[in-house]
Structures are given as structure tokens and as C-alpha cells.
């Protein structure tokens, strides 16, 4: 079993040594990266925009929580190209929660909760930039015990596999212990190959394929509600914004060279802190960054490492926010260590998600309706 323990992570990649030895950066350890002067340019409004993905021909596809998908072009936001509003519910934290294209734009995927609250991943074929409705098929489902902590983000990694974020099942404090259990998909990042079989194949190098007591789909675990995650399009590193319980928000990091199996600690740990008397797991991979709820907000919204061309001073910085605060902030992460923190001095309102366009430029989605692009000031 290829479980990345703290010691194996050190042996497996030098770049993680700094973060494990020094511990994660936190909001009370300020350091300033290169200051980027930016502005938010509202390019469209939508009804509760909640997620998005870069589409073919320089488009950006926007998901609205109630179940519609619309395409953003230079001419604005078009009419819905997909509508599953009769098949989902927005009770609790449910709804249409994530969208993604595969790496050649041949298939489009949606992540949503159905009317029973079950987390569902569906696939559509795409032809000439258009969804083919009659090709729809369900790839994966996961029952949810409660209405919150659904996760729901989906992304294709640089390896061509589909990564799926699922929360711990909800309520509070992970009452079923799902975060640390390997016999459930809840509280995990999954890694599957939807093109490899029906309904999907398991990549042969997934970390738990040889463990009869673990789900083969699991890539990493110990997560509470990994609402938004992304891959650095420059390096392939994985960054996860995991929403905390009541005290600590965290951003987790793993290098592109990771073999998976990271245990991010929940619910034994909240960030680097024992949760309700918990004991730190021996294989705990601490967050690269954490902040408490007395300062920057109360619900982290993970973002992207900026790789666009419009704002040179922002190049290589991880842009993130917080739903309760809305300020756009940055981290400079080098070899798994935060070497700088910044404040972009702009506010996106109830920032629910970021979208990276095909050109590397970033869009900010405010649940109240705004779709804004981060531009040079």
C-alpha cells in the first residue's frame, strides 16, 4: 500500500521537507510577496453562480447553483446550455456544485446533489463545443447522510484522471468518523478514470488499490469539506481549500510528484490543532497554510495559482478568498513552504468560487450574482 506517511513524504520529495519541518504558515506570520495592483472587472451577472470551468474556444462555462449552465464569451453570458434544475435541490448546501471538461474538451462533467441528496457525477459528450444531451450517463454516486459538507468540486488533473472532492457527510464534528475511515468515499479526494471503463476505471497507481479494507477510488483523505481545489497549471501541484469546523481554515498542498495517500488529519485535527481532544495521526500531512476565524473570515474558498499574462506581478501566486470576508489574498508557495502572503486590496463579496480561463486569467464568482475578472489596475 502506497500510503504517504510523514516520513515517506520527506523521503519521496525534498520539496516537502520545508513544510513538514517548519510547520505551516499561518495568518500571524506575515510576509509580503511582490505587490500586484489589481482590479475586479464585472463581466456578467448570474443567478447564484457557484462553479465554472474553462471551455473550448476561449469560453468559460458557469454553473448556477439551481441547476443551469451558461457559457461566458466576449459577448457576455449566454442562455442556459444545460438545465437540470428539476433534478436537484438547493436545500442545505446542495445543488449543482461543480463542472469540468476533460483535457481535450470531448466530455463535460457535472457534480450535483440529486433530489434525494445523493452526490452525483454525470458525463456528457461534447461535439463542436456543444453538449450532446442524449449521451448523458452517470459516472459515480455517493449517498450523503446530511445536507451539508457535500464538497462537490471536480477537476481533471495533469495526468488526465478525474479528481472529485467529497466532504465528510455533514452535521458537525464528523459524527461518523468518515474523515479517517478508508472504507468510505466521504471526507476524501477521489481519483478515477471515467474513460477507462463503465462507469469508470480505477487508476492502477491509486494509493489504496492493494488494501482490501480501503476504497480504491481514494487519492487522499482526512478532509472536512474540501469545497474548492485546483492544480497549478505551471507545476501540477495540488492545492485544496478545506473549510474548518469552528476555529481554523486550512489550505492543503501536495506536489505534482505525489503518489497519493495523504492524510490531512480531519477529524483528529483541525489544521495543525487537535480537534476535541484528538490525537495527531502519525501520517498527518499538515496544511501549508491555516488561519483562525478571528481574522480573515470563516469559510475558506480555495483558488488558483495565477499563470496568466495580464498581471505579471501576480505570476506564480496562489489567489484565494473567504466566503465570509470576500477579500482576495495571495500566498507565494515555494517547494511546499509559504514564503510570502499578500492582500490584493479588492473584495469580491460572497466569494464562492474561482474559475481559471484557458488563458490563465482568473474569474471570481460571488454567490450574490457577480462574475468578475481579476485585471491589472
Where are these regions (language model features)?
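Loop-centered beta-sheet repeat module
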Residues: 186-192, 205-234
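Short beta-strand-to-coil "C-cap" segments at the C-terminal boundary of structured domains/repeats
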Residues: 192-194, 373-377
Amino acid at each position: 500500500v502506497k500510503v504517504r506517511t510523514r516520513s515517506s513524504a520527506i523521503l519521496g520529495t525534498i520539496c516537502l521537507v520545508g513544510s513538514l519541518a517548519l510547520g505551516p504558515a499561518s495568518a500571524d506570520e506575515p510576509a509580503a510577496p511582490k505587490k500586484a495592483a489589481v482590479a475586479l472587472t464585472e463581466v456578467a451577472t448570474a443567478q447564484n453562480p457557484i462553479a465554472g470551468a474553462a471551455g473550448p474556444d476561449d469560453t468559460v462555462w458557469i454553473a448556477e447553483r439551481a441547476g443551469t449552465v451558461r457559457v461566458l464569451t466576449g459577448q457576455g453570458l449566454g442562455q442556459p446550455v444545460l438545465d437540470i434544475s428539476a433534478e436537484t435541490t438547493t436545500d442545505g448546501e446542495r445543488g449543482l456544485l461543480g463542472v469540468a471538461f476533460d483535457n481535450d474538451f470531448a466530455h463535460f462533467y457535472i457534480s450535483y446533489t440529486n433530489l434525494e441528496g445523493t452526490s452525483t457525477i454525470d458525463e456528457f459528450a461534447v461535439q463542436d463545443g456543444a453538449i450532446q444531451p442524449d449521451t448523458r450517463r452517470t459516472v459515480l454516486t455517493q449517498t450523503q447522510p446530511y445536507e451539508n459538507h457535500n464538497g462537490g468540486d471536480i477537476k481533471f488533473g495533469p495526468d488526465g484522471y478525474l479528481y472529485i472532492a467529497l466532504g465528510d457527510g455533514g452535521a458537525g464534528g464528523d459524527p461518523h468518523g468518515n474523515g479517517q475511515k478508508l472504507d468510505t468515499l466521504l471526507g476524501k479526494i477521489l481519483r478515477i478514470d471515467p474513460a477507462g471503463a463503465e462507469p469508470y476505471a480505477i487508476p492502477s497507481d491509486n494509493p489504496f488499490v492493494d488494501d482490501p479494507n480501503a476504497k480504491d477510488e481514494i487519492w487522499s483523505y482526512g478532509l472536512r469539506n474540501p469545497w474548492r481545489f485546483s492544480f497549478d497549471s505551471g507545476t501540477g501541484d495540488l492545492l485544496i481549500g478545506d473549510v474548518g469546523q469552528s476555529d481554523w481554515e486550512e489550505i492543503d498542498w501536495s506536489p505534482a510528484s505525489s503518489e497519493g495517500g495523504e492524510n490531512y488529519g480531519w477529524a483528529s485535527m483541525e489544521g495543525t490543532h487537535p480537534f476535541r481532544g484528538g490525537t495527531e495521526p502519525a501520517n498527518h500531512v499538515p496544511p501549508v497554510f491555516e488561519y483562525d476565524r478571528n481574522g480573515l473570515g470563516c469559510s475558506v474558498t480555495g483558488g488558483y495559482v495565477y499563470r496568466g499574462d495580464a498581471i505579471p506581478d501576480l505570476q506564480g501566486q496562489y489567489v484565494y478568498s473567504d466566503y465570509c470576508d470576500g477579500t482576495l489574498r495571495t500566498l507565494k508557495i515555494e517547494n511546499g513552504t509559504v514564503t510570502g502572503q499578500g492582500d490584493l486590496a479588492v473584495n469580491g463579496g460572497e466569494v464562492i468560487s474561482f474559475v481559471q480561463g484557458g488563458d490563465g486569467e482568473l474569474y471570481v464568482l460571488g454567490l450574490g450574482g457577480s462574475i468578475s475578472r481579476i485585471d491589472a489596475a
